Curated annotation (Swiss-Prot):
NCBIfam families associated with the record: PRK03826.1 (NF003009)
Cellular component aspect of the GO annotation: cytoplasm
Residues involved in a divalent metal cation binding: H33, H68, D69, D137
Cellular localisation: Cytoplasm
EC number(s) per entry: 3.1.3.89
Organism superkingdom: Bacteria
Keyword Metal-binding in annotation: yes
PROSITE patterns reported in the protein's UniProt record: HD (PS51831)
Name assigned to this protein: 5'-deoxynucleotidase PC1_2775
Reactions performed catalytically: a 2'-deoxyribonucleoside 5'-phosphate + H2O = a 2'-deoxyribonucleoside + phosphate
Length: 199
């Protein structure tokens, strides 16, 4: 049986810092970001199913979110303003991401490739699944801004404003629910979020 370097590569996602051009009170890496996006995407899918007559596989969406930035272990994390500077750059970067996704799949033993291709390759996801993961990704970036601003880091002021516009564009009932019920807590201290539920 041949060795595979797939999971050794994925373990290096923790070495890739997000927000590399900005001063951070606390550095965030791609691995922890991916887990948070999985938490939020799963929640959005559950909210849609329970509150807004959705019919999504919330567990699959959590997995898609968990792997949504996996290709960055080969490409690195390109800052959003550069990645989307114009349509041509965005298009070319998408092609690079696609190649990286395929390279990751090819690292796996052949008998596992199709299972992971379904998670790594965007062409195997529905428009609705992609939309939920994109909403969660934008929400998590927004939450990072709130945390940095709460810690006194004004560096994230413009990023927060930009992400508010992005969230408006990706608006959905489930996102509104999440924003109303869960987001306000991210601006509170540990003592404030622990008051109602002491151990």
């Amino acid at each position: 049986m041949n060795q595979s370097h797939f999971f050794a590569h994925l373990s290096r996602l923790k070495l890739i810092s997000r927000w590399p051009l900005m001063r951070n009170v606390r550095t965030e890496n791609v691995s922890e970001h991916s887990l948070q996006v999985a938490f939020v995407a799963h929640a959005l899918a559950v909210i849609k199913n329970r509150k807004f007559e959705g019919n999504l596989n919330a567990e699959r969406i959590a997995l898609l979110a968990m792997y949504h930035d996996a290709s960055e272990v080969l490409t690195g994390d390109m800052p959003t303003p550069i990645k989307y500077y114009n349509a041509q750059i965005a298009h070319e970067y998408k092609k690079i991401e696609k190649i990286a996704q395929q390279k990751l799949v090819e690292m796996l033993p052949e008998e596992l490739q199709q299972d992971y291709r379904m998670l790594l390759d965007d062409s195997y996801t529905s428009e609705e699944e992609r939309a939920i993961v994109k909403q969660a990704d934008a929400l998590c970036a927004y939450l990072k801004c709130l945390e940095e601003l709460s810690a006194g880091n004004a560096e994230f002021t413009l990023a927060k404003a930009r992400l508010e516009k992005t969230l408006q564009l990706r608006h959905s009932p489930e996102m509104d629910y999440f924003m109303t019920v869960f987001v306000p807590s991210f601006s509170l201290s540990l003592d404030e979020i622990s008051q109602d539920s002491p151990l």
